[in-house]
């Protein structure tokens, strides 16, 4: 068992499986198992974990991106297997842009591909099973890189951010939406009580298994706070790094540019 203190810009997430310390190299397999279990109920899980607010936060993320209405505009949505963010981006582009949805988990991608077909968005989307730490793309390929509620599950976040920088075109934008550190004294206590007591129990009711939800709640607490994560983005090479808190810091949208 490790401390519940947040990791920092110096690292630590690579050996943190929630509040449990694991050998470096083992975390990815453990995280994969979590998402194989929750794939078909992933968006319901996000509703439980955010009281439905993740939908508003994702809409705000897409508004901040303001994707070009242009067939040449290319987005890479990482850890986006179910397509929830990519669908929003394509719709915001009047179904003109193209999004590559990358996820390391095949179960999540299967859900996304099925949904894309039902929404008649398959022509605008490519689904790729790959690791965010080793992107299978050439440098300077994408206009935008997005990731929503997925970066904290990547073992080596610093490596993933450097890969994001590599595959973005000059002038390209990084947007990362992630649960973060609540900055309102009363809200932080309420949110902690909800997270550690209610969410695993709701997860058990929905899926019959509380363990994946326990990990996800603990991983939120371990993730670097807003300032530390902004530092990590700058260290990866990004410029004009900013963040916007949503709902008192329950979530934050970080932005950076490859200039």
Curated annotation (Swiss-Prot):
What Gene Ontology biological process does one annotation of this record name? Answer: menaquinone biosynthetic process
What is the name of the protein in this document? Ubiquinone/menaquinone biosynthesis C-methyltransferase UbiE
As for family, the record states:
Belongs to the class I-like SAM-binding methyltransferase superfamily. MenG/UbiE family.
Q: In which pathway does it act?
A: Quinol/quinone metabolism; menaquinone biosynthesis; menaquinol from 1,4-dihydroxy-2-naphthoate: step 2/2; Cofactor biosynthesis; ubiquinone biosynthesis
Q: Does the keyword Methyltransferase apply?
A: yes
What EC number(s) does this enzyme carry?
A: 2.1.1.163, 2.1.1.201
In terms of InterPro entries, this protein maps to:
SAM-dependent_MTases_sf (IPR029063), UbiE/COQ5_MeTrFase (IPR004033), UbiE/COQ5_MeTrFase_CS (IPR023576)
One matching Pfam family is Ubie_methyltran
Where, by residue number, does S-adenosyl-L-methionine bind? 82, 103, 131-132
The alphabetized UniProt keywords are: Menaquinone biosynthesis, Methyltransferase, S-adenosyl-L-methionine, Transferase, Ubiquinone biosynthesis
What job does this protein perform? Answer: Methyltransferase required for the conversion of demethylmenaquinol (DMKH2) to menaquinol (MKH2) and the conversion of 2-polyprenyl-6-methoxy-1,4-benzoquinol (DDMQH2) to 2-polyprenyl-3-methyl-6-methoxy-1,4-benzoquinol (DMQH2).
UniProt keyword Transit peptide, yes or no? no
Instruction: Tell me one GO molecular function of this protein.
Output: 2-methoxy-6-polyprenyl-1,4-benzoquinol methyltransferase activity
Please, which domain of life does this record's source organism belong to? Bacteria
Q: What class of enzyme is it?
A: transferase
Q: Which organism is it from?
A: Agrobacterium fabrum (strain C58 / ATCC 33970)
Reactions the enzyme catalyzes: a 2-demethylmenaquinol + S-adenosyl-L-methionine = a menaquinol + S-adenosyl-L-homocysteine + H(+); a 2-methoxy-6-(all-trans-polyprenyl)benzene-1,4-diol + S-adenosyl-L-methionine = a 5-methoxy-2-methyl-3-(all-trans-polyprenyl)benzene-1,4-diol + S-adenosyl-L-homocysteine + H(+)
